[in-house]
Curated annotation (Swiss-Prot):
Ranges that cross the membrane: 8-28, 41-61
Name of the protein: Photosystem II reaction center protein Z
Reported function: May control the interaction of photosystem II (PSII) cores with the light-harvesting antenna, regulates electron flow through the 2 photosystem reaction centers. PSII is a light-driven water plastoquinone oxidoreductase, using light energy to abstract electrons from H(2)O, generating a proton gradient subsequently used for ATP formation.
Oligomeric form and interacting partners: PSII is composed of 1 copy each of membrane proteins PsbA, PsbB, PsbC, PsbD, PsbE, PsbF, PsbH, PsbI, PsbJ, PsbK, PsbL, PsbM, PsbT, PsbY, PsbZ, Psb30/Ycf12, at least 3 peripheral proteins of the oxygen-evolving complex and a large number of cofactors. It forms dimeric complexes.
Gene3D superfamilies in UniProt: Photosystem II PsbZ, reaction centre
Keyword terms: Chloroplast, Membrane, Photosynthesis, Photosystem II, Plastid, Reaction center, Thylakoid, Transmembrane, Transmembrane helix
Native organism: Drimys granadensis
InterPro entries: PSII_PsbZ (IPR002644), PSII_PsbZ_sf (IPR036512)
Gene name, Swiss-Prot/TrEMBL: psbZ
Length: 62
């Protein structure tokens, strides 16, 4: 169970880092938002899902 928690936490940190870099770039580009809207929403949905997964796994471990 600890390995699953560590992997989920690593995925959350990696997704956060990717979104931290990519979202401002998408908003700064001229046609970036209209062409990359689905990618941003998918990344945000993945991030929210990982937050809940890490919370559930944390409650099971401790």
């Amino acid at each position: 169970m600890t390995i699953a928690f560590q992997l989920a936490l690593f995925a959350l940190i990696a997704t956060s880092s990717i979104l931290l870099i990519s979202v401002p770039i998408v908003f700064a580009s001229s046609d970036g938002w209209s062409s990359n809207k689905n990618v941003v929403f998918s990344g945000t949905s993945l991030w929210i899902g990982l937050v809940f997964l890490v919370a559930i796994l944390n409650s099971l471990i401790s």
